Curated annotation (Swiss-Prot):
Gene3D superfamilies (UniProt xref): Glutamyl-tRNA reductase, N-terminal domain, NAD(P)-binding Rossmann-like Domain
NCBIfam families per UniProt: hemA
GO BP terms in the entry: protoporphyrinogen IX biosynthetic process from glutamate
Name under which the protein is recorded: Glutamyl-tRNA reductase
Record note on quaternary structure: Homodimer.
Pathway stated in the Swiss-Prot or TrEMBL entry: Porphyrin-containing compound metabolism; protoporphyrin-IX biosynthesis; 5-aminolevulinate from L-glutamyl-tRNA(Glu): step 1/2
Catalytic activity, EC: 1.2.1.70
Active-site feature positions: 50 (nucleophile)
Keyword Oxidoreductase (UniProt): yes
Length: 418
């Protein structure tokens, strides 16, 4: 029994190679089935995302090259092209790597939480294909526990490091409750969709989506229960908005100073937060001159993000310490399991010797033999049988000139305590 992790990621491989070695939905099932039947593999999990492809296995000794061969052959990739980008971790290094990955410590965005969900899904997929053995099951369950501990004891995921998340975090800081706020989202691209997801997860239920093409906006409207309007309708709905987050590809500003000024008057000068994450800008810079309008540009958010990245690096130090501690503890536990079979076999052998000699002694007593003589013979034979293997080991170590081995055997037998 040995743990092995092989893979490539955004740090080691190009997008082109990552695409070739990815396990899409059509490949994952067959791959897990092949690993389940592989002679060198006891259990496996495949983690495949846009930034990494990794195979975690409980393998028999000497399976490293066999697993690398399998990966290259499965994807029909030349091994010479794969090897420079491939990393291999064994035993505790494999445990530590999985824990680091699941905690977001090996991610493109340090501390990002999405990877944990992806690892959990990978484990679930493997279990569905009966590819998980006891060691792999215990490893991943422990990893999920460690990831939870890292999130609880550190703030590695508590600081916004994406523009979309930073925009929502800023809104949360200014408005105590997003559930009471109306948010106008200008645009309907990936960034605005991500913003909407963050807003919804923080309790925001009143969203208005304004977009040039209504079809795309309707999709977001259905997904988040948002009202849908055209860009031309923004002036009519702007007074309702406590928060405006804009990200379009418009070459010219969509929201001007006069439009916001009019909206503020209709709002009786209740404050309005405008977060412009578009380049070029969607909101005229002069809007920031209005006393009740708080305008933040993508550059303002970037400075927040840069500061938060540095804070995450500080939190990562503690997270790394937790991972080191937990991976070492798990490895110790795993090694103790490896002794279970040997202990079981040793006890079985001793019991068989005892039962055999006891049976013969009882037969002797039944025929009228002297009890004292029978007991002495039993004790002598039992002693000789039980010390036979250790005696041979001591003799072999001495004859082969292996003092270190001799010392270990003496310590094991407790001879140094005599």
């Amino acid at each position: 029994m040995s743990l092995l992790a092989i893979g490539i990621n955004h740090n080691t491989a190009s997008v082109d190679l990552r695409e070739k070695v990815a396990f899409g939905p059509d490949k994952l099932g067959p791959a897990l089935e092949q690993l389940r039947e592989h002679e060198a593999v006891n259990g496996s999990v495949i983690v495949s995302t846009c930034n990494r492809t990794e195979v975690y296995c409980d393998v028999k000794q000497g399976a490293r090259n066999k697993l690398i061969d399998w990966l290259a052959q499965f994807h029909q990739v030349n091994q010479e092209d794969l090897m420079p980008s491939l990393y291999v971790h064994e035993e505790q290094a494999a445990i530590k790597h999985l824990m680091r990955v699941s905690c977001g410590l090996d991610s493109l965005v340090l501390g990002e939480p999405q990877i944990l969900g992806q690892v959990k899904q990978a484990f679930s997929d493997s279990r569905d294909h009966q590819a998980v053995d006891t060691s792999i099951d215990k490893l991943f369950q422990k990893t999920f526990s460690v990831a939870k501990r890292v999130r609880t004891e550190t703030d590695i995921g508590g600081n916004a490091v994406s523009v979309a998340y930073a925009a929502c975090t800023l809104a949360k800081h200014i408005f105590e409750s997003l559930s009471d706020s109306t948010v106008l989202l200008v645009g309907a691209g990936e960034t605005i969709e991500l913003v909407a997801k963050h807003l919804a997860s923080n309790g925001c239920t009143k969203m208005i989506v304004a977009n040039r093409t209504r079809e795309r906006a309707l999709g977001l409207g259905e997904q988040f229960g948002a009202e849908v309007i055209s860009l031309n309708e923004i002036p009519d709905h702007l007074p309702r908005a406590d928060i405006v987050i804009s990200s379009t590809a418009s070459p010219l500003p969509i929201i001007g100073k006069g439009m916001v000024e009019t909206a503020l008057k209709k709002r009786r000068h209740q404050p309005m937060l405008l977060v412009d994450i578009a380049v070029p800008r969607d909101v005229e810079a002069q809007v920031g001159e209005l006393s009740d309008a708080y305008l933040y540009s993508v550059d303002d958010l970037q400075s927040i993000i840069d500061s938060n990245i540095e804070q995450r690096k500080v939190e990562a130090i503690q997270a790394e310490a937790i991972v080191s501690e937990e991976s070492a503890a798990f490895m110790t536990w795993l090694r103790s399991l490896q002794a279970v079979d040997s202990i079981r076999d040793y006890r079985k052998s001793a019991n068989e010797i005892r039962e055999d000699l006891l049976s013969k002694s009882l037969q002797s007593l039944a025929t009228g033999a002297d009890p004292e003589k029978v007991l002495r013979e039993l004790s002598n034979k039992l002693t000789n049988k039980l010390i036979h293997a250790p005696t041979r080991a001591l003799q072999s170590a001495a004859e082969q000139g292996e003092p270190a081995k001799l010392t270990v055997i003496r310590q094991t037998l407790g001879l140094d305590d005599l």
